[in-house]
Design a protein with these regions (language model features):
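Mature, structured domains of secreted/extracytosolic soluble proteins
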Residues: 2-9, 20-201
Length: 201
């Protein structure tokens, strides 16, 4: 009888220990699955947020603005899309119109987009990307008492000034353009369209 009681006690103890061990394994497995699920959810959420940011970026605005299709094509050729679509900015793009590019000679265009022209193209395009968020109204306010200079991504600067009722912009080389369509707003900046390509090339 004592032997039987001892055996029963031993069996119950062993069963309890085994059950506890399995519970620990299950908890560990469930914990791992939860961690994986959390990581996946976070990745999906980050991916969606990134896609939303790109869809509302200055690059998206350039792509959907008829006047800046050529400028956008060159931005893509120069591998600057990630900079202005994923960068927090803000960026103010002073974008030459399609017509502005059509005024350039074939030789000039070939030098910009030729096989060895990417570096030159990047330099020219970065000279049209201003660091900061500048609306046309804020620029007009700033030029009331004279010229207003802002830095570009290319390490150069652009200077805004008035001539009669026109708002103009010039670069260090002396090239001048007139602002036309302005304040095309995006999540990480805005776009102003100009009637000439700036830069010394």
């Amino acid at each position: 009888m004592r032997l039987y009681s001892f055996f029963i006690c031993f069996l119950l103890t062993a069963t309890t220990l085994l059950s506890c061990k399995n519970d620990v394994k299950n908890d560990t497995s469930e914990g791992a699955e939860t961690a994986v699920d959390t990581t996946v959810v976070r990745s999906v959420k980050e991916s969606k947020e990134e896609q939303k940011a790109i869809a509302n970026s200055v690059l998206a605005k350039l792509m959907t603005t008829d006047e800046t299709r050529t400028f956008t094509r060159y931005i893509i050729s120069a591998s600057l899309t990630d900079v202005i679509s994923k960068g927090k900015g803000p960026y103010t793009i002073i974008a030459p119109s399609n017509e502005a590019f059509s005024k350039l000679s074939k030789a000039t265009l070939d030098s910009l987009v030729g096989q060895s022209g990417n570096k030159t193209l990047q330099t020219v395009l970065k000279g049209h990307i201003v660091i900061g968020d500048f609306s046309s109204s804020s620029i007009l306010q700033s030029v009331k008492n004279g010229e207003y200079t802002v830095p570009t991504m290319g390490g150069t600067s652009l200077t805004f000034f008035m001539e009669g009722s026109d708002l103009l912009v010039k670069d260090a080389s002396g090239a001048v353009a007139k602002l036309g369509k302005t304040d095309i707003l995006s999540a990480n900046g805005q776009v102003h369209v100009i009637d000439a390509v700036l830069g010394n090339f």
